[in-house]
């Protein structure tokens, strides 16, 4: 409970410490470490929590590469980041607090990607918040993967479809089938909700881009929706679902809002009537627009989507059901 309390206390602010140190010698040593929260010791001070000043952000290129031995990761997904941060301000995301984007040195990235290619890792998932927010960075990585493709490894990227350029679309169209898969967060098509969560989106362009990518038949596309957002009730979410479903992605994920501590959404949750679980993942239970019963119904719909759509086992049945 103490660890949980301190973690929640620290995450309630704009914490961004990335280095780890071992401290010994009592409270004075702890106070000298920037970017931590700890409970003071001593008579009458057990309930006092101290938080030290923020530390400077670490150079992303200085972080060590952790996958020098591929053995433990055989037949497993490897997670990798070439950038950290996001220029956008989506209110449910912690990256909205600080809009800085830091890039790992591109030569270092290429060297590390080559390691994955040389060892024929099955899948590498980039954890970059919006991989293509820096267009030159994205293009250089996609070109490198195309030129050094081993015919085995798949790379997963989370992108913003409505900022893809014509040049980027042409690069993607020329990739080996299965080399890349793209996850695109549509989240909602409700304009009022998009404005409230500070997520400007061109839904028409997203639709065109997804269709364009689909024409090449070489990239697995995964589209996301989020239930439980402000101003989106059950009927509105149904409209969002219909729009995304009509884009015919390979995977359609119906997710549920997570009210992350420290995010703008957390600060405004009470005003939205949002109730959520008190422990991680802090998932929405109801809102002023969506009842608990409707959330439960959406959970069942999520299971149906996984079973009948995402399993890809009902490709002949679903078109018939859609007409009925």
Task: Enumerate the predicted regions with their spans.
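Glycine-rich beta-alpha loop elements in corrinoid/cobalamin-binding modules
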Residues: 1-54
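Short aromatic-enriched loop/helix-cap "lid" or pocket-rim segments at secondary-structure transitions
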Residues: 53-55, 63, 138-139, 168-169, ...
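Radical SAM [4Fe-4S] cluster-binding motif and immediate context
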Residues: 65-215
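Conserved residues at the C-terminal ends of beta-strands
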Residues: 1, 39, 96, 127, ...
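Radical SAM enzyme core and accessory elements
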Residues: 14-25, 41-45, 86, 300-324
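N-terminal [4Fe-4S]-dependent radical SAM core
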Residues: 33, 37-82
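Conserved C-terminal portion of the radical SAM core fold
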Residues: 110, 114-127, 152-158, 172, ...
